[in-house]
A protein has these predicted regions:
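DNA-recognition alpha helix
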Residues: 92-105
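Basic, short loop/linker segments at the boundary and entry of helix-turn-helix/winged-helix-like folds
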Residues: 34, 38-77
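Helix-turn-helix DNA-binding elements, focusing on the entry/boundary residues of the two helices
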Residues: 89
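Active-site- or DNA-interface-adjacent structural scaffold in DNA-acting proteins
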Residues: 108, 112-146
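Catalytic micro-motifs at enzyme active sites that drive phosphoryl/nucleotidyl and oxygen chemistry
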Residues: 64-67, 106-112
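Alpha-helical support elements that line or immediately flank enzyme active sites
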Residues: 76-86
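Charged, often Cys/His-bearing segments associated with DNA-binding zinc-finger transcription factors
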Residues: 1-48
Length: 146
């Protein structure tokens, strides 16, 4: 059973649409996060992408039964970062546990000390394939042209 995203914000959590980025940054992480922020604030686009994720990520598993697993939004954020940055799971684990802006994008507030374990990332983010990213890219491009 997977939840798209927890709708109840926690104390200290920043709404994803309100995350601020340094406009002078030349690093690639803020650019990726801005793209994810665009997906988040565009409701029609977000719904199409989550429909795709629900179909593609472990389709044989009963979505109404069992433990919740990692939220689809977190799989999307981590999967896009891993594939776009061409990083291994060790670096991804370091980024999602210690990079403040990435943690905000994952829905963690200032007081949330939840961390991600290597194996959890590997098991869940590993379901996010380059082919799935390509399908998402096609949906985003269509939304940009429409």
């Amino acid at each position: 059973m997977r939840v798209i995203q927890n709708e109840q914000m926690q104390i200290g959590e920043v709404d994803i649409s309100q995350i601020k980025f340094d406009p002078r940054s030349r690093d690639d992480i803020p650019k990726i996060l801005k793209g994810l922020q665009y997906i988040y604030v565009n409701l029609d686009l977000r719904e199409k992408i989550f429909e795709l994720l629900e179909r593609e990520i472990a389709p044989q598993i009963d979505k109404r039964n069992g433990r919740p697993g990692m939220e689809l939004w977190k799989i999307l954020v981590c999967g896009v970062l891993r594939l776009d940055l061409n990083e291994d799971y060790d670096r991804l684990c370091e980024l999602v546990n210690h990079h403040n802006t990435i943690r905000e994008m994952l829905g963690h507030g200032t007081f949330n000390e939840e961390t991600y374990h290597f194996q959890t990332l590997k098991d869940n983010v590993g379901l996010f394939t380059p082919e799935l990213l390509d399908k998402i890219n096609q949906i985003v491009v269509q939304a940009g042209h429409g």
